Amino acid sequence: MKTATILLTTFITLSAMSCSQPKGTKDYLKTVLDNLEEIQSATYYSRVETWHPGDTAVVYDLTYFIREYDNPSDTTIGAIEIQTSADNHSHLYYAYDGKMKASVFEEHKGIMIDSFKVDRNLPFRPVGPPFYNYTKSILRYILTTKDSITLEKRGNENTFHLKLTIHEDRQVEFFGRAYKIPDPPFRDEDPTSRYEIWIDKKTNLPYKYRREMSHNISAETVSDATFNNNKIEDVDVTGYFPEGYEIRYYGDKKKTSGDDVDNLIGNPAPGWTLTQTDGQEISLNNDKGKVVLLQFTSAGCGPCRASVPFLNKLTQEYPNADFVFYAIELTCKNISGVQAYKKRVNAGFNFLHGTEAVRDAYVIQAFPVFILMDKNHIVHKRITGYQASVDNEIRGLIHGLLK
């Protein structure tokens, strides 16, 4: 794709491959990158926010205290991160040291360790890099890529604001460096990737980025940063592990318990009362004597969106009073987010706004999950994930229960 440069008074659009970039822009980005390269360690507060596309309601908004270290010995991400509570800097949430990542689950008093021994068939290590490592990768990409990109520059006397748009046939993410993401099944979305970076002109360092994909939007803002006061030789992430927590390893089979998924089958479905997109409250008890199909879904889930055409047809195929279907969205913060998602995917069926209590009761750990119950609301079948073969499987199960 041929790139072009357009220069306006207050707005500049340029391509990294253009020879006619406004003088000073590329040199300034090199200066910022050089400053980032000088950071051997940093501590800062990090505010992380996420949104669903088309929805202004924030799904996730939390602030952490971060210890970040440059780690050249790690040829994947190239950094160490220790994420703790903003109020208690010893209270660990997450850590990555180049050899493993550790995630703390307080509700289960457990720590999940991933030593990357399980092959995920990915070209990158699935680790979210810390802020300065992440923005460094983006700037390095801008200065060196041969991809088709557009870079918009705005700003004022205090801030240099960049907006990077990547016009490739696959989305580009940054895990230590740029990677073109393999297309997942059922994704028919816009592959355009958009990144924005805000740079403080006093320090010539980034303080915020925003990442926008067709399936997810996120942003991170840092504050109160200090640099190069800590040594990587002193880092021991295991020293932050809370005492008494069970350590488990990614890939190990979990032992079954009274709360395990399999124990739902053959037992009465947990009851619930949830709000529909039209504001009406719906209770499972209202559908006594009906076969009920639930889909637990997420606005950010590609396979969930891919199932919508099938579910639209399904509700038309079984319009009688003996069958009812509900999609329960579990990641939107409010009903307006569910409404926006329903409209965006052209769903012609009922959407309910789920709760954490419902998520826990049905042991939902991934999306989508289908739960089919008989007329007595005994759980008959659970299906995790979606592919074309699921259509006929669900149709056959419903037909059998309606006899």
Model-found features: residue ranges?
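N-terminal leader/targeting segments and the immediate start of mature chains
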Residues: 18-62, 66-70, 75, 144-151
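An acidic-aromatic
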Residues: 71-131
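Extended beta-strand-rich segments in extracellular/periplasmic secretory proteins, especially
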Residues: 132-201
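Non-transmembrane domains of secretory- and envelope-associated proteins
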Residues: 186-193, 202-281, 287
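Conserved redox-active cysteine motifs that mediate thiol-disulfide chemistry
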Residues: 296-313
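Thiol-based oxidoreductase modules, predominantly thioredoxin-like and allied folds used
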Residues: 321-336, 347-356
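Short, internal strand/loop/helix patches
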Residues: 339-376
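Thiol-/selenol-based redox modules, centered on thioredoxin-like
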Residues: 372-403
